[in-house]
Amino acid sequence: MGGTLKILMDRILTGAIREGRFDVIWPDGSSSRYGNGETPAAAVHIRNQAALRRMVINPGLAVGEAYMDEGLVPLNCSIHEVLTVLLQNIRHGGVPVIEWNLKLARILRPFIQANNAVRAKHNVAHHYDLNGRLYSLFLDRDRQYSCAYFPRGDETLEEAQAAKKRHIAAKLRLDRPDLTVLDIGSGWGGMALTLAKDFGARVTGITLSEEQLAEARARAAASGLSDRVNFELMDYRAVTQQYDRIVSVGMFEHVGVPNYPTYFETIKRCLKPDGVALLHAIGRFDGPSATNEWIAKYIFPGGYSPALSEVLAPLEKSGLISADIEILRLHYAKTLAHWRRRFAANRDAIAAIYDERFCRMFEFYLSGSELAFRLNNHMIFQIQIVRDQEAVPLTRDYMFEQERSTTFAAAAD
């Protein structure tokens, strides 16, 4: 059986690895080399037959699991280098077992993404209710757990996250104090606190994470902003009040395609007639697909990064208007590279909170996600949404003017 598994994996790698070099030491101690180049290069040891069997059957899930369980070990390189070789090659297709599993995942997608209120809260808790200290060890000081914005390209993480908030605020057109803002998926409160402190807004932030809620409320109190910012444990579907502005950053990925009509109907119901909303989310260039099985199992259950075509149809059907759309291409790759380096620098402290297997899981997640944006057709889209065409000026000049004129601290402690 072991010989058969080796033959099958050899066929997969021979067909897949066309660029760079990939070396494998098999469970029996023999070795093979794949590819016809020198870079990128990586080498691994597949240490046991169980890991090999799982990777032959379902590599999209099993490669990550094998790394977590030390059934697959990088040799004189990092998992980031291993994934660089693999993803640079399989992005061109030609791996039948991966394509078959992807087709099956697409068929099952409506059931996997049926994120009702109960399931949505459970899914959020899976990732966002982890020990809060973990995130402080690799995020910026403001705990912005979403794509930063690099207008120059050489910003620090703190500078880029501040630029992201400034960029979004400009699109919200916060042109007067005391505008009411709904922040859907408010996280640890950084966006809401910035909009209140620097733009005089009155913000309601909603989240399904109890850990994030407690931290956000504590930050509001410590900043003296509790009279302007209110955080609630609430599903977006339960909101009834109307707001001047609505912002949602990094939350839409958890909604699920079957719930997009409800999401946009909620935006329309809760946005005042002359209001402005801004949706910031991960998307994909290559059309509708399915979430990687490993990511769905270990990181974001129920999560999905849609094609823009999947988003615009239900938005238009709701009667809302897309006033402005911007695609941010490599900004998240740069953000994730910062997170990956910070995680590596604090790995011992993180292992003390959890364990080595958890660290390998997170390393795989951060590296795989970064490479998805560099090599695998992922991007960020920002959609400015209105109910009335006259809610914003005729040209984008007002965004640039406000963004240039706005200065605030890179991060709020």
Predicted regions and their residues:
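Feature captures hydrophobic
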Residues: 1-155, 159-161, 167, 174
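Conserved SAM-binding loop of SAM-dependent methyltransferases across substrates and taxa
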Residues: 188-199
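Conserved SAM-binding loop
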Residues: 216-217
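A short acidic, Gly/Pro-enriched loop at the edge of an enzyme's catalytic core
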Residues: 237-246
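A short glycine-rich, Lys/Arg-flanked "PGG" loop and its adjoining helix->strand segment in the class I
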Residues: 261-274
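Conserved beta-strand signature within the Rossmann-like core of class I S-adenosyl-L-methionine
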Residues: 274-282
